[in-house]
Curated annotation (Swiss-Prot):
It is found in: Endoplasmic reticulum membrane. One of its GO terms (biological process) is intracellular transport. This is COPII coat assembly protein SEC16. It comes from Coccidioides immitis (strain RS) (Valley fever fungus). Residues 606-626, 1635-1647 have a biased composition (Pro residues). It is a peripheral membrane protein. The gene is SEC16.
Length: 1717
């Protein structure tokens, strides 16, 4: 197209002529008539005055309309040509008009360009000077620059189109005429019409008509000449003889050039063609060569099939190739004749400077003409240098089609070109006439070497085909398939994409390059082509280079590469689908050109791609392709070639064994190891879901994970759902998305595992007892795991014992049982640490700090938790997550402000900071201002109009205010409407407000929902306020359009739900009455849409003003069951969430414990607490679970919850069962079921329960003889303990008895503490408590049992007595020191009591009463009371004088501790008569103590209060008694006990809670007097101990002795309690137990309080002794003597009074009793 512009003709007639001559004649030479040839011959003399119409390659449009009979409109052709020319050569000068080939109008530059065009047409490879047709032709004459030859340019053109035409044009006028005569064998009349039509088209151009007519005529005859042999023969002979004159040759060359220019109109190619003036010379030879091809006379190309039609571009190329060949050998001097100095210099300049060729300036419009097209052709053959050269000799192949470069762009297959060239071209001629050989004036183009080198480049191209076959390289070329030549021209003439495509086939075949120079195109064209061919060949090897040379490789590439590309994408999927496609991997195409780089994939060597196409892709994408495959596939990495694929096939199995690291390396962009599967040689072994894919992939090599390599895939892990999703998202990784992360492990692990499986076969000894028939072969053994209560895990693995036999090389395996191991479940299963650290149960305000810390930790954990696991954010899930965090924050505020959310300024400020962060700092900028700023809308309130006012006025005049209101609304006079409606019914005012909100607020646009809801609340529309957030129509599922809605895009009707926070904040900041109704309504709305957390927040903020918000799941009115749990949508699973239960417990703690006006506990929550306790027990947190059980019992037994419907039999049964199991289970860190008592436990809450048992529960149990149903069965020996006479009940009696004397007192109902029943109850009850309460309970109950055990000992009297004596003697001391010692005697103490059983029987009634009292006393002493409890049987006195004696005893004990010797105290302790009196008191006390009916009750506070009271009373008594009875040592002793009490740990406890004196203190004083009267002994009003002793005397000595013995056992230390030593024992029988007389002085203080009660009972027991504790020492001995029938009696005697007992305890009971006697 640019060629036309160079010639100065825009009409395009020349192009049409070319089509007529090139297309029709070339393809259909038979169409031409002799007349046409004749006309051409005649017209050869016509001067070339219209070269302006330089032939252009036909445009695409022309190609479509290339009908020879009708030419397209001039304007169409011109426009198309102009466009192409401008695109190809933006810098090209305007087309030259009326310029001939010889002389071009314009600058010399333009002339040089035209010359170059001419050269391009002629293709001067030899450099002969007669090439330049531009210079050879004169502007005026239109003849060649060589004056000798007058060539008819039109004829030349016609010949050029037809190859023969070029020959005709090149010859001089005479020669042309001769030739014409020879050629014109057919009439041209037929063709004249066509020529005329073309001339008519070109009528506008000067001389164009004639010129084109000549051209057309010439073109047709040319074709005819091709058909006629004789003419061609003549022409051939003429050429061979060298008759053709240089001028003629130049002319012919010009004609040919013009023809080529037309055909080859390409941006850069034309430039080179234009620069080829030297081509004019070869054009002559071409003429000679072409003539044989075109002329029927001369058949220089017999190789061409006459009947075969060749594309004109092919024929043209052949002509060009042959021209230089013929010219060079035939006429070396022709150049001189043809070329002028100027022309030669210009050509030299053009040819000598390679840069000029590349520059755009040289790329002239004229150059773009035929030269560009020719260059393209040349480029194509140049790339396939060898192939093209060989094929180029036949001129016909390119000659016919050269005229149109656009046609070449049209997509002529390069393969076709190459093949045609191969057939037509004579490789020898091309070689002989290579451009380097024919360079004129000694000019050598730098491209000459490339021509020679072409064959060398061709071999590499050949290599490329093996790599990926031809397709891969072509794929690259295809990708750049035939870009406009102009685009390639810019890089350099060599790279015209148009030229590249034809050579694609050529480069692959690599024909000799020499033939390309032969082509008519200028050497410049050829040279650029060569350069392009080089990169293109390289491109083959590397996929990217292929892209660079798309044109050259295009023909070949398009075929294979396109399929390969789809294969890449499809292959990964198929591979992942476990389908081993034989086709190349989707990525193999890319690697095809770079098969050599394939080694790079070796890094992926872990999995060599199978020899099929897939192997190559795997190397690229799979983490570890086979190394060998990688070598081939490294190129495949870029793009896998078929060759690589084949190599991969062989390698895939080996590389699979490669390490996972290599697999990870597979894709640089894919750090993830998804390719691991590919690396696994034994993919089939992999069990994962991706394994099947691996199975197929094993052959295919690792799946291509290029897409799946992203780290995101690795995160989810193979089993994660996210990974599955990724697999689908990324087909390449779909194959192993899940296993991609596991792949590295699976690869290394599975492959070897698979290999190891067969190797692990063992030869088992088959059983013969029938087990061998077990299909599961369980006789081979299998691991066993068993989960036990309390978070223990039992496991055992079978052992395989080898057995060898003679003659056997390998042993046979005999499975046997393995070791059984236990471990806490926490070591096996992970736990949620934040939840495990919950500081529950929450029973006191002291837990507030811990609760706040825990809440903060949980909030931080929730905020830091990832919102999603798969990278996909679900809006609904995200909203719920945010709402959940807000809920926890609101609960924290509730705890911080002691259960108040509203009504407190601080609490409201905290809530505001939660609902609207930043509002505190920016009150004017945060949400409200932002809301106002974002509000937008076109609707605005209308100003009051006179018309509206008039209407309102009229309505008011008429007295119709309601009508006036709606008139105001209609006119949007809202102020008037509201003012008037306020005087009417409130409903009218609400309606007006609603209308105002709907039309004035909601219409404003966005972010008005919250404000509208607030206005509704102001209007009193509480329930309807939620309609502003979500319209009723939306809730009903309808889509409504508001007439008053503001402008803007429609929005989701449910979007208002996200405004709930702003709405709640507005309500809180603008409180009005009954706004809680709106909050509750908002909560229900949110709950209906699944926003449970937000709903619960609204309910909490609303409070309980509108009714309870918590309830059971079956309660339809309950808004909340568990905070954060949706019981509506998940009625059966909502309780599974532990967080919900714990958060609700925190709420309960804030409202019922921290609140100023505490509300009752949540009754429905207790069942959930019980479930939580079960969970804790399962995890091994038994102590926490037990605490929960106790807390639940305390709440259940409280008065406020007694009648709750939530407490039913099923609940109680579950609670009781869990409590018993926790007691039976070993305590933490202990393997025994008995917990060791400790001081901390003694001071724990367990004492409260112990006190409750002592007060009434134990008594009931004792009377029933079975105790609590669970109590008797608590311990492992509980049932045995049920028959104390048979053996000592393994209760905690001995060791714990000292601490648990109060529980044994319960047997008081049985009538005797010493009775076996009481013993049984005491031990079993104590173990129960000890278990439930850990060491504390155990410690407490054993003492009572100890007391009983003493009496029982008397039953068993022999061995047990000494044991008990020892135990008690030591126990009192040690009891206080450490209940653990008692624990050791758990049940034995009771057994020890058994020997004393007979005595117990005697004293049993007395014991009962003291026992009853003892519980109370024990409640006071707690720790020491237990020891005294052992003596409590003797403490009937205590029932009367409990408090009094306790006080005195305490002082006495401290003072009397040294006088451990007092045996009388023992005897006094034995005095049963006092017990009878005490029994009454004890009974009375029992009546007082029914409060503590159940062990479940926590009476810590009560116990402390009682203890304080008793202490106070005891102090008073001690002071009085010290002043009266102990004036001497008693006073000092009294002080000592005080000090001792302060020193003792019990004293510390009671000292803190010293409150009102207990009634018993008074009784103690009275008891001393009473005892004096009843016994007629021990009358010592001052000394309550003596009084107790007096009361004790009445009972028989023996009976008293056993009882006293048991008591004394507990009281042994009591002797020291007495100032004298005796009063102590009588006064504090329990005290003696706790502290033996000799060395237990330090303990008296605690014993005093705790022992007091025990001492009371002991005092009752040692009637005489207890009565006269101070004075009683002498009486005590008497009693002890009378009672001391045996050692047991002596031992029992130490039951002396409280005071003595307490002191004696520390010193040692046995010491006092035995030694005294």
């Amino acid at each position: 197209m640019a060629e036309d512009r160079v010639l100065g003709h825009e009409s395009g007639l020349f192009t049409d002529a070319i089509h007529l001559g090139a297309w029709n004649p070339a393809h259909r030479p038979e169409d031409f008539s002799d007349s046409v040839l004749h006309e051409v011959a005649t017209q050869t003399s016509v001067p070339i005055q219209t070269p302006d119409l330089a032939p252009c390659p036909p445009t695409e449009f022309e190609l479509e309309h290339r009908d020879p009979e009708a030419s397209p409109p001039d304007n169409v052709l011109d426009e198309t040509k102009d466009v192409e020319y401008l695109q190809a050569f933006p810098e090209a000068p305007t087309r030259l008009e009326n310029s001939g080939h010889v002389d071009i109008t314009g600058s010399e530059y333009m002339q040089s360009i035209e010359k170059t065009r001419e050269g391009a047409v002629i293709d001067s490879n030899n450099g002969s000077p007669f090439i330049d047709s531009f210079k050879g032709s004169d502007d005026d004459t239109g003849t060649n620059t060589f004056p000798d030859d007058n060539i008819d340019f039109q004829a030349m053109i016609g010949q050029t189109h037809d190859d023969t035409r070029d020959v005709w044009d090149r010859s001089t006028d005479a020669h042309v005429e001769d030739l014409s005569t020879q050629l014109v064998t057919e009439p041209y009349s037929a063709e004249n019409d066509k020529v005329n039509s073309w001339n008519s088209v070109f009528a506008d151009d000067e001389g164009g008509g004639d010129f084109f007519s000549q051209i057309s005529s010439q073109s047709k005859p040319t074709v005819a000449h091709l058909e006629s042999e004789p003419r061609s023969d003549d022409m051939a002979s003429h050429l061979s003889n060298g008759n053709v004159q240089p001028s003629n040759e130049s002319q012919q060359t010009k004609a040919i050039d013009s023809l080529f220019q037309e055909d080859e109109s390409t941006g850069e190619a034309d430039f080179f063609n234009s620069q080829g003036p030297a081509h004019v010379e070869p054009s002559l030879e071409l003429l000679s060569e072409t003539q044989p091809n075109s002329m029927p006379e001369d058949h220089p190309l017999p190789s061409l099939d006459p009947g075969k039609e060749l594309p004109h571009h092919q024929s043209v190329a052949v002509v060009q190739d042959e021209k230089p060949e013929v010219i060079r050998p035939a006429e070396p001097g022709v150049a001189e004749n043809l070329g002028e100095e100027e022309l030669a210099e210009r050509w030299k300049a053009f040819l000598g400077d390679d840069d000029i060729l590349i520059e755009n300036e040289t790329l002239d419009g004229s150059i773009e003409g035929a030269n560009t097209h020719t260059a393209e052709y040349q480029r194509h053959p140049v790339q396939p240098a060898s192939q093209v050269g060989s094929e180029q000799p036949p001129v016909n192949t390119y000659t016919p089609h050269q005229p149109s470069s656009s046609e070449m762009l049209g997509g002529l297959p390069a393969a076709g070109y190459s093949s045609t060239l191969g057939n037509l071209t004579n490789p020898e001629k091309s070689k002989v006439e290579s451009f380097s050989n024919q360079s004129k004036a000694g000019y050598q183009s730098p491209y000459d070497l490339p021509f020679d080198m072409r064959p060398k480049h061709a071999p590499p191209r050949k290599i490329a085909p093996p790599v990926g076959v031809n397709p891969p390289p072509r794929s690259s070329s295809m990708s750049g398939s035939r870009p406009p030549s102009s685009s390639y021209m810019v890089p350099g003439p060599n790279f015209s994409p148009v030229a590249a495509p034809p050579p694609v086939s050529g480069p692959d075949t690599t024909p000799p390059s020499t033939k390309e120079p032969v082509r008519t195109g200028s050497f410049f064209e050829e040279l650029p082509v060569v350069s392009r061919s080089r990169p293109s060949t390289r491109g083959r090897y590397t996929p990217q280079p292929n892209m660079s040379q798309p044109a050259s490789n295009l023909p070949m590439a398009p075929v294979a590469p396109p399929p390969s590309l789809p294969q890449q994408s499809s292959d990964p999927y198929s591979q992942f689908q476990l389908q081993p496609p034989a086709r190349l991997d989707p990525y193999s195409n890319l690697s095809a050109p770079p098969p050599q780089p394939a080694p790079t994939t070796s890094r992926y060597s872990p999995q060599p791609p199978p020899p099929g196409t897939k192997p190559a892709p795997f190397p690229r994408y799979s983490p570890a392709p086979p190394q060998s495959a990688c070598m081939t596939s490294s190129a495949t990495y870029v793009s896998q070639s078929p060759t690589v694929q084949s190599s991969v096939n062989a390698l895939p199995f080996q590389p699979r064994t490669s390490s996972p690291l290599a697999q990870h390396e597979t894709a640089k962009s894919y750090p993830s190891p998804p390719r691991k599967r590919g690396s696994l040689p034994v993919t089939s072994i992999i069990p994962t879901s991706s394994v099947p894919q691996f199975g197929s992939d094993s052959q295919i090599v690792p799946p291509k994970r290029s897409m799946t390599q992203s780290p995101g895939r690795m995160m989810p892990l193979q089993s994660s759902v996210a990974s599955n999703q990724n697999a689908y998202v990324r087909p390449a990784s779909a194959h192993g998305s899940k296993s991609s992360i596991q792949a590295p492990l699976l690869q290394s692990a599975y492959a070897p595992a698979a290999n190891n499986r067969p190797t692990q076969a063992l030869d088992f000894v088959v059983p013969t007892d029938g087990q061998e028939h077990d299909p599961l072969e369980r006789w081979k053994g299998a691991p066993i795991f068993k989960f036990g209560f309390g978070g223990t895990l039992l496991s055992t693995f079978p052992k395989h014992i080898p057995r060898y036999a003679t003659g056997q090389m390998t042993p046979r395996i005999k499975p046997t049982l393995g070791d059984i191991k236990t471990c806490p479940i926490s070591q096996i299963l992970p736990h949620n640490e934040p939840l495990d650290k919950f500081p529950g149960p929450l029973k006191s305000k002291s837990k507030k700090k811990d609760v706040l810390t825990w809440l903060s930790t949980m909030i931080s954990a929730l905020e830091g938790a990832p919102s999603t696991t798969d990278g996909h954010v679900d809006p609904v899930h995200q909203h719920r997550r945010e709402d959940g965090i807000l809920l926890w924050k609101v609960v924290r505020v509730l705890v911080e402000h002691d259960g108040a959310l509203r009504g407190s300024t601080a609490a409201e400020a905290s809530l505001q900071s939660i609902f609207s962060p930043g509002s505190m700092a920016m009150n004017s900028q945060f949400e409200y201002p932002s809301t106002g700023d974002s509000v937008s809308g076109s609707l605005k309130s209308e100003s009051a109009s006179s018309l509206g006012i008039d209407v309102i006025h009229k309505s008011l005049v008429a007295g119709d205010r309601q009508k006036a209101v709606w008139d105001a609304v209609d006119h949007r006079l809202w102020g008037h409407a509201m003012l008037i409606s306020s005087t009417l019914d409130k409903s009218v005012w609400k309606q007006v407000t609603q209308e105002f909100i709907r039309r004035e607020v909601r219409s404003l646009g966005k972010n008005t929902e919250s404000l509208a809801a607030l206005y509704e609340i102001f209007a009193g529309n509480f329930e309807e306020s939620i309609d502003e957030l979500v319209p009723p129509s939306a809730r009903a599922g309808l889509q409504m359009v508001s007439v008053h809605a503001g402008t803007g895009a429609p929005k989701d009707a449910l979007e208002g739900l996200n405004k709930w926070r702003d709405t709640v904040n507005l309500i809180l900041q603008n409180k009005i009455a009954q706004d809680h109704q709106a909050l509750r309504a908002l909560g229900r709305l949110l709950a209906s849409y699944g926003r449970v957390e937000a709903s619960h927040i609204c309910s909490l903020v609303a409070g309980t003003a509108a009714g309870p918000i918590f309830g059971d799941a079956r309660d339809p009115q309950a808004s909340i069951v568990l905070l954060g749990a949706d019981h509506w949508r998940n009625p059966t699973t909502f309780m599974v969430e532990r967080e919900a239960c714990l958060l609700t417990e925190v709420y309960e703690f804030a409202t019922s414990v921290l609140a100023a006006s505490p509300s009752p506990s949540l009754a429905h929550l207790q069942a959930f607490k019980l479930r939580h306790a079960m969970y804790l027990a399962e995890e091994g947190h038994k102590s926490e679970a037990q605490q929960y059980c106790e807390a639940i019992v305390s709440i259940v037994t409280s008065k406020s919850n007694v009648k709750s419907p939530y407490y039913h039999q099923r609940f109680f049964a579950e609670l009781d069962e869990l409590s018993h199991r926790l007691r039976q289970a070993p305590t933490d860190g202990s393997s025994s079921w008995i917990s060791k008592p400790s001081m901390e436990k003694v001071s724990g809450s367990m004492w409260a329960k112990f006190n409750s048992f002592v007060s009434g529960d134990d008594n009931e149990v004792t009377s029933n003889g079975s105790g609590k149903g669970g109590d008797g069965d608590i311990g492992p020996f509980a049932k045995i303990a049920g028959t104390p006479p048979i053996s000592r009940s393994p209760s905690v009696a001995e060791g714990h008895g000292s601490y648990f004397p109060s529980q044994p007192v319960a047997p008081s109902s049985s009538g005797s503490r010493y009775a076996p029943n009481s013993q049984y109850y005491a031990p079993y009850s104590s173990p129960e408590q000890s278990r439930g309460r850990r060491s504390l309970d155990a410690q407490r109950s054993p003492p009572q049992t100890a007391g009983r055990s003493y009496s029982q000992r008397r039953n068993s009297q022999d061995p047990s007595t000494p044991l008990e004596g020892n135990a008690y003697g030591s126990m009192p001391n040690h009891i206080y020191a450490s209940p653990a010692t008692i624990g050791s005697h758990i049940t034995p103490p009771q057994a020890s009591h058994a020997p004393l059983a007979p005595v117990e029987e005697i004293y049993s009634p007395q014991i009962q009463s003291p026992t009853s009292e003892m519980p109370a006393i024990q409640t006071l002493p707690d720790g020491f009371g237990i020891n005294q409890t052992g003596y409590m049987p003797l403490a009937e006195q205590v029932t009367r004088d409990d408090e009094t004696n306790l006080k005195t005893t305490t002082t006495e004990q401290s003072g009397y501790q040294p006088p451990t010797y007092e045996p009388p105290s023992f005897s006094t302790g034995y005095e049963p008569p006092s017990y009878s009196a005490n029994v009454e008191d004890n009974e009375h006390s029992d009546e007082e103590k029914p409060k503590k009916k159940s062990f479940m009750d926590d009476d810590d506070d009560d116990f402390m209060a009682r203890a304080a009271q008793l202490r106070a009373s005891e102090k008073e008594k001690m002071d009085r008694e010290a002043a009266e009875a102990f004036r001497k040592a008693a006073e000092a002793d009294a002080k000592r006990p005080l000090a001792t009490e302060k020193k003792g740990w019990f004293s510390g406890w009671f000292g803190k809670k010293e409150s009102g004196g207990a009634v018993r203190a008074d009784l103690g004083d009275e008891n001393s007097f009473y005892f004096d009267k009843e016994l007629n002994r021990w009358v010592n009003k001052k000394d309550p101990g003596s009084a107790a002793t007096a009361a004790v005397t009445p009972p028989p000595p023996k009976s008293s002795a056993p009882s006293s013995q048991s008591v004394s056992t507990s009281q042994t230390p009591t002797t020291p309690n007495l100032t004298n030593g005796r009063p102590g024992p009588s006064a504090v029988p329990g005290g003696t137990l706790s502290a033996p007389p000799p060395g237990i002085a330090p303990l008296p203080t605690p014993p005093s309080s705790s022992l007091g009660p025990p001492s009371d009972s002991p005092r009752a027991i040692p009637r005489s002794v207890s009565a006269g504790a101070p004075t009683g020492p002498p009486s005590r001995p008497g009693t002890s003597l009378s009672n001391a029938s045996s050692i047991d009696d002596l031992l029992g005697a130490p039951q002396a009074r409280k005071g003595g007992t307490m002191k004696t305890r520390r010193k040692g009971r046995g010491y006092v009793d035995v030694m005294a006697k």
